[in-house]
């Protein structure tokens, strides 16, 4: 479990190549087996302070599960084309938008969410990453798309409607 996380944080210590081999062989039978080797998103290693205890450590021990949300209708995986926005409002961020093809969101506790927080001087999206609890008001986890080639794999649609999360 958490085989991609460093051993000093309680993970399995596998490097990217070894993890790829594990997932490749599990995937020959069924993507459902990949649940056995559930792995936290590597970006969680950037957590600091209270976020380590709230998100990173419980995800490594299996107490909490995460998913990652970047893909959007109309933009696919083109992050610069994403429409999901996060806007500062006092001591909160307010998030609005839709993500789709989100693996296993229905069994996750929180999402590693990428959203646009403004534009640069050339009009390109500035992106930020947020940790959002999926039981948070303003978050809807909906059934995604049936995938013929992915036995045991479930993807979801995430809708964010005036979802408020505190500035940290």
Role assignments for model-derived ranges:
Residues 13-25, 78-82, 159, 165:
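Structural signature of FAD isoalloxazine-binding scaffolds in flavoprotein oxidoreductases
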Residues 62-70, 114:
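A short, Trp-centered hydrophobic/proline-enriched beta-strand micro-motif
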Residues 22-26, 115, 132-137, 161-165:
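Short Ser/Thr-interspersed hydrophobic loop/turn segments at strand-loop and sheet-helix junctions
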Residues 81-83, 135-167:
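Flexible, small-/acidic-enriched active-site or ligand-binding loops
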Residues 96-141:
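A short core secondary-structure module
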Residues 59, 74-77, 101-104, 120-121, ...:
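Short Gly/Pro-enriched turn/cap motifs at secondary-structure boundaries
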Residues 1-63, 103-110:
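Internal helix-loop-helix
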Residues 75-78, 88, 93:
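Hydrophobic, small-residue-rich alpha-helical packing segments that form membrane-like cores
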């Amino acid at each position: 479990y958490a085989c991609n996380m460093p051993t000093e944080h309680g993970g399995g210590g596998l490097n990217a190549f070894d993890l790829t081999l594990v997932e490749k062989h599990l995937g020959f039978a069924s993507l459902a087996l990949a649940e056995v080797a559930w792995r936290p998103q590597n970006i969680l290693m950037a957590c600091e302070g209270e976020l380590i205890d709230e998100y990173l450590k419980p995800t490594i021990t299996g107490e909490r599960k995460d998913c990652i949300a970047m893909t959007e209708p109309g933009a696919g995986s083109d992050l610069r084309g994403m429409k999901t926005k996060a806007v500062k409002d006092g001591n909160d961020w307010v998030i609005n938008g839709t993500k789709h093809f989100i693996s296993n969101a229905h069994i996750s506790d929180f999402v590693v969410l990428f959203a646009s927080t403004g534009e640069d001087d050339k009009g390109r999206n500035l992106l930020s990453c947020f940790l959002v609890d999926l039981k948070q008001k303003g978050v809807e986890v909906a059934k995604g798309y049936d995938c013929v080639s992915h036995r045991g794999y479930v993807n979801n649609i995430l809708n964010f409607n005036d979802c408020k999360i505190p500035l940290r």
